[in-house]
Amino acid sequence: MTIRDIAKAAGVSPATVSLVLNNKSGVSEERRQVIQRLLTQNGYEKRCHDKSSLNILFVKYVQYGTIVEHNGDFINRVLDGLQDEADKLRINLTMRNLNSHHFDEIMDCFKTGGYHGSIILGTELDDAFAQKLEHSPIPTVVLDNMVENYELDSVVMDNRGCAFSGVRYLIECGHRKIGFVKSKYDISNFHQRYEGYRSALEKHDIPFEEKYVFEVEPTMHGAYHDMLNALSKGRELPTSFFAGNDSMGAGVVKALKQYSYRVPEQISMIGIDDLPFCSISDPMLTTMAIPKETMGRMAVRRMYEKVLGDSQECIKKLLYPHLVERESVAKL
């Protein structure tokens, strides 16, 4: 049984069950005993929330592998923020990997592993798994995915706003033929960035042209080869691209240069992430920088609030990126 099921059986709200599970006040003794009996019968362990001994499980969820496993720089910076905030709050942080085939295993771990809460790296999180997470027996915060349609706390970049701002910058630089480097994998973040791109064009009365959307693997190597294939077919090119991430942008730039296109003189490029290679690539890549460490710190802080019962509302936190101007965008 999930927390919601137990709440229904006991005739109380899920929040009341959470109070008992987390050994908090605010529940009558008679009702507490009923709820505790149901919790025990279903394998839930009462947790003692001494502020000096909170145990949080960080789960790196992998659905495709291509996106998460090829973005180690991004993830490592997020982890730096997670660990830094956990150390400040005296939280024990345990890390595990998870794919869609091991959901039952991780739910058992939530129930019996002695964890007070979990933080899920949800970059590749799909709807099916998000729906299951809504019934998590412990407080859960999703990182790097808005999980818009689900009652789950989240900390994520404003993907739509980020893409909108990046495309607006290209427009301010004089570009009207603006393409989009789109991931073949339609995860939430990439989809929202595409929406932001479309929205910016519409806002500035620039017609959307499907021919300027190039689908590639969301890795530098994959984007390079997919763009080479597109160029070999003689596809018409815009004067600039907004890429769904830096890796795709860099891969496309490499392919363009191999076909003797000059970047940014002939074709400009802007990405998202501000990964380390952006400052040493040729040309150095203009990008929208994500506050990665801040994302990690905010996820831990939000989990801390939930576990201690300071805030039980579902809160979704958006972080706004900022533009880092380098060498890959030309003014027309």
Outline where the language-model segments fall.
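Short hydrophobic segments within beta-strands
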Residues: 59-61, 121, 143, 180-181, ...
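Alpha-helical recognition/docking segments in bacterial nutrient-uptake
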Residues: 55-168, 172, 231-232, 236, ...
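Alpha-helical structural signal in soluble globular domains
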Residues: 38, 81-85, 132, 192-204, ...
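N-terminal helix-turn-helix DNA-binding module of bacterial transcription factors
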Residues: 1-53
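Short acidic/polar active-site loop segments enriched in Thr and Asp
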Residues: 13, 45, 116, 176-177, ...
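Flexible loop/turn connectors
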Residues: 226-332
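Hinge/beta->alpha junction and helix N-cap segments in small-molecule ligand-binding domains
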Residues: 61-76, 95-103, 155-165, 181-228, ...
